[in-house]
Each structure stands twice: as structure tokens, then as C-alpha cells.
Amino acid sequence: MKRPFRGLRRPPNPRYDAVVIGSGIGGLILANLLAREGLQVLLVEQHYMVGGYCSTFRRGGYTFDAATHFYPLLGNPDTLTGRLLSELGVTTGWVKMDPVDTFHFPDGSRFAVPAGFDAYMAKLKAEYPEEAGALDSFFAAVRETYLLGLLHYFRGRPLSSLERLAPYHDLTVKQALDRWFRDPKLKLLLAADCPHWGSPPGRTSFVFDSMLRLSYFLGNYYPKGGSQAFADELALRIEEKGGHILTSTLARRIVIEDGEARGAELEVLRGPLRRAWQGGVVRSGVVVSNGDLLLTLEKLVGPEHLPPGALEPVRRLRATFPCWLSHLGLRGVPAGVLERAQGYYWDSLDMERVGRDALRFKLFAPTLYEPDMAPAGEQILIVQKVLEMDYHGVDDWERHKREIEDFIFTNLERVIPGICGHIVVRNSASARTSWRFTLNHQGAMLGWEMSPDQLGDGRPASETAIRNLYCVGHWTQPGGGITPVIVSAQQVAGEILRGRVMASRSGDRRLAMDVTDRAPQAPEPCVGGFLELKRTRRE
């Protein structure tokens, strides 16, 4: 697969202003923001492709999304998220998804979510007229918590200044649904996409869910060319801004001296660069980890460099579920069959068992939005199954794979009879596969759970106990998902850029900018709401 960015083909410079470890969307956006302000940036990725979960792979002429295929807001230029991509020079094309999602229920009925909010509300009220008043009240609360949540989690407004958020702050999705509704099927319908959070509704924040729920209606998109096209273009823009990218290169440790991050020790794993440079220490003013937080603190930093007891609160945090994926290349299956079959398949109304037996799987056909992902006239189907599992309790991953695949293909035949005879290419990815290619703890989908107690101050901050060491992405604030990790990148970029200005004023040349007579523009965290929040000038 030819990539548009070049990547370093020579040894890296001995020193950079910033080293970013990991090229998920958080790392890619952050590197772009820093490079845009003139910082010399090195982005390091252990895989041979960039993107993390937002990447693709090819098998037999089919291009499969490794994981992510759901991109709220990014294709809408009227949202601040979409506008940010434009400011960074990203020209990726986006296909709007309508319906947004489809839910298949145990009684055989289905509900397709329209892309327009008014149409969605009208459809809900038509199917549940006895709950019409409750729906109005519920979505009034959703809208309010959405805006207040943006101020709190994305803009950093303290909870004490947002009195109207207090009644909702500790509320879970399940508690909210039980408060407003009686019909168990309507409750499931309103939480039927909860697998995208990687946790059951009883452990998912109502506020954070509200923020995503309403963002659907500002546009939910699939990238032209697939996820890799988006990630690769972000990498290309980094290089155009003067940044460097090292793929197939593992960060072995973060160099800590006198309590400060001073660089990273790197090892080239494969590729032609290894003949000229096997690895070594690259010095930097700041280091940012876009990787797994436990791996960062336990292995790259080391407990000896952390304050006593610093690791225990992190080890107690709950990670999101892993997601099993089966990627299928199909021949001779009409697009209309897949269009009808797409969506979440629920076998029980008990949504708390989402990672066990309540949710059969989700089906998604990317070729309905981007036909070029498959050979002409052929199709791709991705089967996703969220799994609540004991990762370390699996002693035979091959047997685990056989059992899950047997379940998936037996049930897939129930949905689309005869489909197994049309499979040309078949590939499956377990939690262990996700860990292998991304190094995410136990193959977690979205970092830590987005439960009320693991958001805000309950979630690790981007600044660490080590000076000049930051974290970005779904293992830190504000949370998991495409928009939150972009906000994370903006927040970290702002901290780094403001820190460099302060260092230049104090005469600390290790962090100071080369040009000290002007402050770079620290990016405002983006929001993508029904209402755009006014930008406030930072003093």
C-alpha cells in the first residue's frame, strides 16, 4: 500500500523540540499543531503504518479498516472539529452516513436512526407515542448536559462554576433512561449504540454520552479511501510543516534526567533505515506519549522515576472492553442486501450484558460508502463484537478465535442466509491482535472507561508527574472517541506552547522558542455542537 508521506529514510536529528510517541489520531493532530507553530517534531510509530486504530490493511485486493470507521463531525466544515482539519490543510473527502445507525431488536423489528434530529424525534414519537412527553424532557436534558459537558470536559471550566451540570455529573446512561422512561424496548433503542463506548450503560457517563449523541446530527462520516487515507494525510501535513516521522520504530524508554523528560531511546525494528541506524537516544525539549498510559509509566518511564504511590491509582482504573473484528471480502452479494443487514443485533433487552450475550454483533459495510475499498462490483462486511472478557484468563488464543468465529459465522448465516458461500477473503482480529499492533492495554477499544468516576479529575491528566512529559489520546483527559482525542491534542499543544513561552521569558533555553518576541497561538479546544461556544482569549 503506497503511502503519501515519505517517512525518515536517514537517522533522525540528534535533538528535536518535541518527540511524540505513537501515531494514533491524537498523536497525529498534536504533531501537526506543534509543527504548525515552528517546532521541530519527531513522530515515532512502532507499526509500519500510522493511524493506530484508524488504519487499514489489504488482503486479496480488499482494503479493510483495522478498527475505526465512525467519524462524527469531521466532514462538516461548520463544526470546529471540521474547521480545524481545514486549517491543518487536510483535504480528505468524507461521505455522510444516513441513516446514522440501525438497530435490530429481539422481536425482529428494526429502527434506522435518521441523520436529521427533527426526523429522528418524529420517528421516535411515532413509534412510542405514549412516551412523547418523556422524550421531549429527556432530550432537553441531553441538550443541556451536552453544552455544559463541552464547557467542563473540553474547555476545562471547573464543575463548581457549572451549577446546572451538578445534577447530571454522576449520572450513568442507565440511570438517566430509568429516570425518564418506562418502556424497556425504548430504553434499549436509546442505548442500542452503547457498544461504541466499550462499556455497559450502567458504567457510562450520561454527560459524555449526551455529547456524542447530539454530535451525530451534525454529521457522521466515513472517509473517502478509508481510515488510512485520513491518517496518511495527517502524516503528510506533518512533513509539509517540517516534521519528521519514524515508522517501524519502537520507543524503548523515555530519558529522565533530574526529574525531567529529556528525550527517548528508540529502536528501529525493521526496514531499510535499520541498515544505517539501529536506534539510539534522541534528545528533546518535551516528550509526549500517545500510547497506553500503563505502558508509558511502568515501562518507558519506570516506577523509580515516579513519586511513591503514583502508579496505584492508574492500575485501579477500568479499561474499556476490547472489540473482536471479522473482516470479510464478499463476491456476488448485492449492495442492497448489506444495506438492509447493517446495524447492531440485540438478542436481549438487558443492555448491561452488552459485552456478554445481549448483543450478538454489529455489521458494517464500508463499500456502501466507498466502493473503491473492494474490487469492482464486490463488497466488504465488517463484523464487530464487543467482549467482556478476562484477557489474562485466555490460555489458548487459537481456541478463543475458533469459538468466537464459530459463533459469528453461525449467526451471520441467520442474518444473511448463504453468505458464507460468498466469502472470498476472511480475516479476524482478537483483543490480542489489537494489543499487538497498537500496544493498547488488553486491546482496549477506547482507553479507560468513560464512567462518571473516570472522567474529569477522575481521569489521568495530560500533564504527568515528570516535568516536560505529557500524554495525549484516549488514556488521558477528556476521554475516548475521535473528537475527544482531537480535543486532547489541542489541550496538550496549548500546554506545551504556553510552557515554551514562559520558558523563553524566564531564560530556560531547554524549552524556549528560537523566536522569543511573539507567543505562538495556542489552539482552543474544539467543540462541535449545535451552538458554537465563543472563543475566549487566554491571558
Language model features by range: what are they?
Residues 3-141, 450:
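N-terminal glycine-rich phosphate/pyrophosphate-binding loop and immediately adjacent elements
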Residues 252-375, 513:
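Mid-domain catalytic core of redox enzymes
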Residues 1-18, 36-37, 451-455, 463, ...:
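Extreme N-terminal leader/targeting segments of oxidoreductases
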Residues 78, 162-175, 215-237, 246-248, ...:
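Short beta-strand to alpha-helix junction loop
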Residues 331-433:
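C-terminal segments that line or cap access tunnels to active or ligand-binding sites in enzymes
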Residues 183-197, 358-362, 418-478:
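A glycine-rich dinucleotide-binding beta-alpha-beta segment and adjacent secondary-structure elements
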Residues 106-204:
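Rossmann-like flavin
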Residues 210-277:
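Helical element adjacent to the flavin cofactor pocket in flavoenzyme catalytic cores
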